[in-house]
Amino acid sequence: MVGATTPAHAADLTAGYVALEMEPDARFPFISGIVEGIAQTRARIDGSETQTTGCIYHWFYEEEKSYDNILAAFAKFQDRAPGAIVDALIRRRCDA
């Protein structure tokens, strides 16, 4: 499979890799997938309460600098998991 992530490669998929080595056209879809996963998890946890999920979507898709802030955090914490960094930024912004 071309482009498949194997367990050996998954360990190398650090925030630094995403920020510095991943093809620029692949970064946004990859990061938006993380955001969508976190938002959907919050939606399941929160049930009919949609405030946190709405905050997540607003933060990522509508706030001007959210994507740039994510990339800056990835560059700063290069050895961390991308999902953990996005989750921390969401928790800080949306009190999730």
Residue ranges and their predicted role:
Residues 37:
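Cell-wall glycan-active module
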Residues 5-10:
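Sec/Tat signal peptide C-region and signal peptidase I cleavage site
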Residues 12-17, 24-25, 40-96:
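Compact alpha-helical subdomains of small soluble proteins
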Residues 1-3:
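Bacterial N-terminal signal peptides
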Residues 34:
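Globin-like tetrapyrrole-binding proteins
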